[in-house]
Amino acid sequence: MTTQLPHEKGFHISWDQIHRDSRALAWRLDNHGPDDGAWKAVVAITRGGMAPAMIVARELDIRTVDTISVVSYHSGGGKADERREAKVLKGPDADLMGDGEGVLIIDDLVDSGKTLELVRTLYPKAHFATVYAKPEGEPMVDTFITGVSQDTWIFFPWDMALQYVDPYRGKD
């Protein structure tokens, strides 16, 4: 196991911080939906978008929540994660989604924008929101809270213990 960061810079996010930033995202989205300011549903991009989506749904009192599972990274076996072509593993309910109008699609981070680019082609009228955004991916997101440099690696609390630990079942 390497002791080096996967990228030049690391930004550690605590549970408290992701909660505060996700609430800030909800406040920014409040009263901006197409139905008199309301949104009809929240769709989380799994897995990273699940915690922010839960918080946004709670804050905006949105009861219809679904997920879309997109894979665009491959764990590099102790090396930095490697990008690969994005593909949908599980889509949200088709009747709910239509072209995406009135739906908030939430993720934790837009990095290269490849995941959001794929999902946007499927649901062009959805509103895409992330908590954090890197410059390369910013054009793919409609609303975000905090910008971070492209060379910053974000360590989310669901990936961390006192030090990084691999998931019990391994990778991918």
UniProtKB/Swiss-Prot annotation:
Binding residue positions for guanine: D111, I154
Keyword annotations from UniProtKB, A to Z: Cell inner membrane, Cell membrane, Glycosyltransferase, Magnesium, Membrane, Metal-binding, Purine salvage, Transferase
Binding site for xanthine: D111, I154
Annotated GMP binding sites: R84, D111, S112, G113, K114, T115, W153, I154
Pathway(s) this gene product operates in, as recorded in its UniProt entry: Purine metabolism; GMP biosynthesis via salvage pathway; GMP from guanine: step 1/1; Purine metabolism; XMP biosynthesis via salvage pathway; XMP from xanthine: step 1/1
Membrane topology according to the record: Peripheral membrane protein
Binding annotation for 5-phospho-alpha-D-ribose 1-diphosphate: R47, G48, R84, D107, D108, L109, V110, D111, S112, G113, K114, T115
EC number(s) from the headed UniProt entry: 2.4.2.-, 2.4.2.22
Catalytic activity: GMP + diphosphate = guanine + 5-phospho-alpha-D-ribose 1-diphosphate; XMP + diphosphate = xanthine + 5-phospho-alpha-D-ribose 1-diphosphate; IMP + diphosphate = hypoxanthine + 5-phospho-alpha-D-ribose 1-diphosphate
Gene Ontology biological process terms from the UniProt entry: GMP salvage; purine ribonucleoside salvage; XMP salvage
Cellular component GO terms held in the UniProt record: plasma membrane
Binding site for Mg(2+): D108
Keyword Glycosyltransferase on entry: yes
Keyword Cell inner membrane set for record: yes
Cofactor(s) the protein requires to work: Mg(2+)
GO MF terms held by the record: guanine phosphoribosyltransferase activity; hypoxanthine phosphoribosyltransferase activity; magnesium ion binding; xanthine phosphoribosyltransferase activity
Cellular localisation: Cell inner membrane
Main localization category: membrane
Job of this protein: Purine salvage pathway enzyme that catalyzes the transfer of the ribosyl-5-phosphate group from 5-phospho-alpha-D-ribose 1-diphosphate (PRPP) to the N9 position of the 6-oxopurines guanine and xanthine to form the corresponding ribonucleotides GMP (guanosine 5'-monophosphate) and XMP (xanthosine 5'-monophosphate), with the release of PPi. To a lesser extent, also acts on hypoxanthine.
Oligomer status and interactors: Homotetramer.
PANTHER family with a match to the protein in the record: XANTHINE PHOSPHORIBOSYLTRANSFERASE, XANTHINE-GUANINE PHOSPHORIBOSYLTRANSFERASE
Family membership noted in the UniProt record: Belongs to the purine/pyrimidine phosphoribosyltransferase family. XGPT subfamily.
Protein's recorded name: Xanthine-guanine phosphoribosyltransferase
Gene from which this protein is expressed: gpt
